[in-house]
């Protein structure tokens, strides 16, 4: 299930106002910081910033805190393989669950985790991986799946036009 519009996300690991001001106002922000355990101050600043510019804000891999702080949703990374990660919580209305996957097995897991949007990567060649999906494999893997898939990885000016070929 694909939509015809593009959504753009930016992953951030800290509240840096000068970096945030360089982003377009219609970019959704995902806070992902696995190094700093005490990051509540950053999260609260980012929440306020996103509220002021009217953009969506997601927290990575902490559904309990995402619900408690009334964020727009949660991002579940590919390494989170807990099938019942979401089922134990009463989700607020319009709470988005975004996942990340690299193959069919991970896609099916993210669907079981109730993800309504899934980053699928890498679509194009990237330095840190020998394998990439390509347009045809991306389209085949997302065929008849009930989620919105987001292309991630290796997108640049040379292959940007190929994005239009994705389902």
Segment roles from a protein language model:
Residues 1-84, 89-117, 146-147, 155-165:
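Conserved N-terminal beta1-alpha1 strand-loop-helix module at the mouth
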Residues 36-37, 125-130:
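Short, small-residue-enriched loops and turns at beta-alpha junctions
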Residues 44, 131-140:
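Charged helix-capping and loop-helix junction motifs
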Residues 121:
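Flexible, gly/ser-rich surface segments that form the specificity/activation loops bordering the active-site cleft
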Residues 124-125, 156:
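Generic, ordered loop/turn and secondary-structure boundary motif
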């Amino acid at each position: 299930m694909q939509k015809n519009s593009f959504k753009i996300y930016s992953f951030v690991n800290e509240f840096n106002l000068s970096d945030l001001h360089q982003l377009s106002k219609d970019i959704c922000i995902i806070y992902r910081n696995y190094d700093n355990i005490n990051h509540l101050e950053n999260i609260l600043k980012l929440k306020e910033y996103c509220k002021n510019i009217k953009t969506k804000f997601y927290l990575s891999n902490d559904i309990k805190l995402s619900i408690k702080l009334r964020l727009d949703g949660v991002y579940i990374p590919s390494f989170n393989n807990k099938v019942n990660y979401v089922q134990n919580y009463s989700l607020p209305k319009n709470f988005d669950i975004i996942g990340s996957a690299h193959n069919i097995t991970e896609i099916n897991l993210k669907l079981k985790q109730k993800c309504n949007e899934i980053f699928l990567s890498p679509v194009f060649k990237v330095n840190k991986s020998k394998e990439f999906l390509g347009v045809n494999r991306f389209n085949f893997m997302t065929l008849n799946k009930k989620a919105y898939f987001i292309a991630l990885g290796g997108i640049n000016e040379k292959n940007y036009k190929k994005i239009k070929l994705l389902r």
